[in-house]
Amino acid sequence: MDSDEGYNYEFDDEEECSEESGADEHEDELELGEVELVEAGLSGSERAGLCGEGGGSALGPGPGGEEDEDYRYEVLTAEQILQHMVECIREVNEVIQNPATITRILLSHFNWDKEKLMERYFDGNLEKLFSECHVINPSKKSRTRQMNTRSSALDMPCQICYLNYPNSYFTGLECGHKFCMQCWGEYLTTKIIEEGMGQTISCPAHGCDILVDDNTVMRLITDSKVKLKYQHLITNSFVECNRLLKWCPAPDCHHVVKVQYPDAKPVHCKCGRQFCFNCGENWHDPVKCKWLRKWIKKCDDDSETSNWIAANTKECPKCHVTIEKDGGCNHMVCRNQNCKAEFCWVCLGPWEPHGSAWYNCNRYNEDDAKAARDAQERSRAALQRYLFYCNRYMNHMQSLRFEHKLYAQVKQKMEEMQQHNMSWIEVQFLKKAVDVLCQCRSTLMYTYVFAFYLKKNNQSIIFENNQADLENATEVLSGYLERDISQDSLQDIKQKVQDKYRYCESRRRVLLLHVHEGYEKDLWEYIED
């Protein structure tokens, strides 16, 4: 835009937002901060839904006591992330002294790496730098503006909608291309909302790659939700490029976790979500991120469909079309019109040499036939193995979902128990039991991912014994919590629940300590999928 004076990214509760579409380009321009957007018409409830409520920071460890006390982190709001971004821009601008919007574009080009930007900025070739970043050198703006000044006396046609407007209704970037306010607004809204573009929106003129600065976007967009979407896209770039920051993966949560160093550690967001900072998945102890990624991919893609096809069908030995046997006869005829090969289902050899052996193949010792059968058996064994671990993984996942619903039932039971002369403190054992139950379910779920890739050795046998013991105790605890509690059985069930959840807690700790000891001593060997 024509002027960047007075533009800054700071929050200012006193500042008013100017939304007049035909305002002079030298008037005060909007800031990128959320406070200004709220003043522009975003209600408190809308803002809470988009940005998350609350402020300040939460330091680990979080609930449950599982987190490493030495792994410190903060949970930041979108506003606090914006302030971090502002501070980064300010630090760079103290040296290069460019308009804030230009500096933001330069930093985005270098993935918010201040050192790389500084190095390139002072290597003596500024024109090449600004060209690569798709912005006009700020030192040449005044000359460009003079070359592109129009006569204000005549109506001019917009080059997008071809309607005539006074010159005052046109605006543009430093490249000199000007369009009417309405076309600008619709163009920017489409780019932001429909295409999800933020930092890479270019001038709408054909062949022009100059990027639209933040001032222009915030001045020409009137919908406060579009502005917040744009702000989120810009801050998302800042977060994604910073290895110490990670968005909370929970749906509709706009908090960011900031750590002192990146690692595969559990972190708790203010929304209640616990996740692995390294990979962003739900916390998945004892399996490492690498193997969990492979497992998720294996479950999501069509690899197991391929396994089923390999286990239940065979390829025609001539044209390699997949064939499923639908009768008892071993004499197979390929249905491919261009093939029509006849072969034996058992050995996959040509049918003609079989003579009259219609239901009995006597060619088991031929190398090619044996190799085909061996491959078939391996595929079947691999499929059965995958289904074994997948079924147990999914079973614990489903049970975990049911157990989360237990909290409501437990709350009701706690209220009933308080009516039978038990204090609030005395009934807290039920909530503690559900907490432990959910932790055990989660751990057991991921032990099956760990076991799927684990090679058999003496340590794996110990692991499987620990897993079986924890699994059995978890099922017993789950059964206790689902029972109806009467006055007569109150004390008995309380003792059983307390004993069992303490045992589960202890066995879970033993299992995890053993797995981590194996990591430290390099005891585990893996099956490459």
Swiss-Prot record:
Region of interest (UBA-like), ranges: 77-125
GO CC annotations, alphabetized: cytoplasm; Lewy body; nuclear body; nucleus; ubiquitin ligase complex
Zinc-finger ranges (IBR-type): 228-289
Gly residues bias locations: 51-64
Record-annotated membrane-spanning stretches: none
UniProt binding sites for Zn(2+) 3: 248, 253, 269, 271
GO MF: ubiquitin conjugating enzyme binding; ubiquitin protein ligase activity; ubiquitin-protein transferase activity; zinc ion binding
EC number: 2.3.2.31
CDD domains given in the database record: BRcat_RBR_HHARI-like (cd20343), Rcat_RBR_HHARI-like (cd20356), RING-HC_RBR_HHARI (cd16626)
Top EC class, one word: transferase
Region (Ariadne domain): 380-529
Keywords of this entry: Cytoplasm, Metal-binding, Nucleus, Repeat, Transferase, Ubl conjugation pathway, Zinc, Zinc-finger
Catalytic activity: [E2 ubiquitin-conjugating enzyme]-S-ubiquitinyl-L-cysteine + [acceptor protein]-L-lysine = [E2 ubiquitin-conjugating enzyme]-L-cysteine + [acceptor protein]-N(6)-ubiquitinyl-L-lysine
Classification via PANTHER family: RBR FAMILY RING FINGER AND IBR DOMAIN-CONTAINING (PTHR11685)
Protein name as it appears in the record: E3 ubiquitin-protein ligase arih1
Biological classification of the source: Eukaryota, Metazoa, Chordata, Craniata, Vertebrata
Gene name as annotated: arih1
